[in-house]
Regions:
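NAD(P)-dependent Rossmann-like dehydrogenase/reductase catalytic/cofactor-binding core
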Residues: 224-359
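Internal alpha-helical scaffold of NAD(P)-dependent oxidoreductase catalytic cores
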Residues: 139-251
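Rossmann-like NAD(P)(H) cofactor-binding subdomain of soluble oxidoreductases
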Residues: 73-74, 78-141
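NAD(P)+-binding Rossmann beta1-loop-alpha1 motif at the extreme N-terminus of oxidoreductases
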Residues: 1-49
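Short acidic low-complexity segments
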Residues: 49-68
Length: 359
């Protein structure tokens, strides 16, 4: 199986390093010509869980990557999911796997754009419940793989295909486990409920460009309590949608070797989190991604299912006041009522579900 990586940020470079170590070098594409040129000319210096100076092969176009690869890892920010899907339209090959690695409703967006073509060509669209590798980029041709989680959820837009996708990925990614649906993977993503309060209560630090540690300095016991309140609402919304999700604390304890009694303890006892730097700008994914793609959908689904979300509403209102942006209006352009089509055992064959969603 040939892997293609879409996006050469820290997570894309981490995936490239991981696959190289596994004896499965990937083809990499990024929308930035400079990033592509740097990687092609100088390769990638990996440190941490993978060590070494690694060669990187790049594709000049998204179409070239699609033509040469069997498994496409979409490692972009959430705002890049739809443009990537539009760029891939008409270029899928039979039997390909398209895997979105940061949830945020990415698989649903891909299905909205590519679903009919994917069904006709036997392609599988999937997403994970978060990033498997915690990584950062010290420099343009560098990546530091801090740690690798022991387990993450994965689901396909067609739940019946999840097992086959897991088997295809298992040689390189044995950490993935089956989720019931892409609603479970997107609603299991706990980054938004974690990052939102941290960003709000450290907004002055971000605005001033200060140097601080995200969890060691930015997550106090009171901030952790706010995270827990948002997480209670996330779980309530998910259960109203018929989706079995676990709490943020349960998921953290699943991902790391030593269980902890509270969210505060889970973050502060993990050395990987203690060295993570906090954002030094308000133009950061904690705001531009986690609010519209993570928290706003919870509010919209809460309204749809009659689940009150006072903590989420308050947090988004404060960000609207500070940033002058309505993040609810920036939520993914999905038919939220139609998401039940992605749940198992809905009666319609996959082609019928996708046609209904496209109408």
């Amino acid at each position: 199986m040939k892997y293609g990586i879409i996006g050469a940020g820290s997570t894309g470079k981490a995936a490239a390093a991981w696959l190289h170590q596994a004896g499965c070098p990937a083809l990499v594409w990024d929308r930035s010509p400079r990033k592509r040129a740097d990687l092609a000319q100088s390769g990638l210096l990996a440190t941490g869980k993978v060590e070494g100076q690694l060669p990187v092969e790049t594709a000049d176009t998204l179409e070239e990557l699609a033509a040469r690869c069997d498994i496409l890892l979409i490692q972009t920010l959430a705002e890049g999911h739809r443009p990537v899907a539009e760029g891939l339209a008409g270029h899928l090959r039979p039997g390909q796997i398209l895997l979105v690695t940061n949830c945020c409703w990415g698989a649903a967006e891909l299905a909205q754009v590519l679903g009919q073509e994917a069904a006709e060509k036997g392609c599988r669209i999937a997403e994970t419940s978060g990033q498997l590798i915690l990584a950062n980029s010290p420099g343009p041709g560098q990546v530091y793989l801090k740690t690798v989680k022991k387990q993450l959820l994965l689901a396909c837009t067609d739940p019946a295909a999840t097992g086959a996708v897991l088997e295809a990925l298992r040689p390189e990614w044995p950490q993935y486990a089956a989720a019931s649906s892409i609603l479970e993977t997107s609603l299991s993503g706990t980054n938004p409920v974690t990052h939102g309060p941290i960003a709000l209560f450290n907004l002055a630090r971000m605005d001033n460009g200060e140097d601080y540690r995200l969890f060691a300095d930015g997550l106090s016991p009171l901030t952790a309590r706010c995270v827990e309140q948002l997480d209670i609402e996330r779980v309530a919304v998910a259960r109203a949608c018929g989706v079995p999700v676990r709490t943020a604390l349960e998921l953290l304890n699943d991902a790391w070797p030593t269980p902890q009694p509270t969210l505060y303890d889970a973050f502060h006892s993990n050395p990987s989190y203690m060295v993570t730097k906090g954002p030094a700008t308000t133009h950061h994914r904690f705001i531009t991604e986690d609010l519209p793609y993570g928290l706003a959908p919870l509010v919209l689904l809460g309204r749809l299912h009659g689940v009150p979300t006072p903590a989420l509403d308050a947090l988004l209102d404060m960000f609207r006041l500070a940033m002058g942006t309505d993040y609810i209006a920036l939520a993914p352009a999905l038919d939220w009522k139609g998401l039940s089509a992605f749940l198992p055992y809905q009666g319609l064959p996959l082609e019928g579900k996708l046609a209904a969603l496209a109408d």
